[in-house]
């Protein structure tokens, strides 16, 4: 996590050495935004910070808790509204399959309900990929987490899109998706 002061220093260096740079983008977590005030975010926006990609992954409190994300659906709303107030564009990432077998529809509905309260520039879809060195892989081996099938993930994505009622661009062009679009 980069502090406000560190981001400010980086922004000033970029402005000094890359004078024609129009936008400074980055990846962030909801918890990275939380310690920054709206005034600090406005200062960063003035330096060119814009187009932040946020790996929210879900807007379902149960899924967020089980995956130890460290924030709630309400936190997503609060922090993204701070970005909006600071006039910083942001992109949200939704991770299909994260809730596990049989839980995708509820996850999709709750996430769409959260995203419908926001104004993301884009919503990116990525499908869960479990790596052998992850804690989730260990949970799968123990039987405490069962992965959603590809069919379930497609149904989850369809449910999410059908419930999403905001003006945004939807992107699903990653190799992790069953049907990239």
Predicted regions and their residues:
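Surface-exposed cleft-lining segments at the edges of enzyme active sites
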Residues: 62-69, 96-102, 144
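A short acidic, glycine-rich active-site loop
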Residues: 144-151
């Amino acid at each position: 996590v980069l502090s406000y002061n560190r981001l400010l220093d980086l922004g000033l260096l970029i402005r000094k050495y890359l004078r024609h740079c129009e936008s400074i983008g980055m990846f962030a977590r909801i918890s990275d935004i939380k310690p920054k005030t709206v005034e600090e975010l406005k200062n960063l926006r003035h330096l060119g910070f814009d187009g932040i990609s946020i790996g929210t992954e879900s807007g379902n409190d149960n899924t967020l808790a089980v995956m130890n994300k460290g924030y709630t659906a309400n936190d997503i709303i609060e922090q993204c509204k701070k970005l909006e107030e600071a006039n910083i564009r942001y992109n949200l990432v939704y991770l299909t399959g994260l809730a596990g077998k049989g839980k995708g529809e509820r996850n999709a509905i709750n996430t769409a309900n959260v995203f419908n309260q926001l104004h993301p520039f884009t919503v990116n879809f990525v499908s869960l990929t479990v790596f052998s060195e992850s804690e989730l892989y260990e949970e799968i081996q123990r039987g405490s987490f069962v992965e959603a099938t590809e069919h379930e993930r497609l149904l989850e994505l369809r449910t999410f899109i059908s419930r999403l009622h905001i003006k945004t661009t939807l992107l699903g062009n990653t190799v992790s998706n069953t049907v990239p679009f």
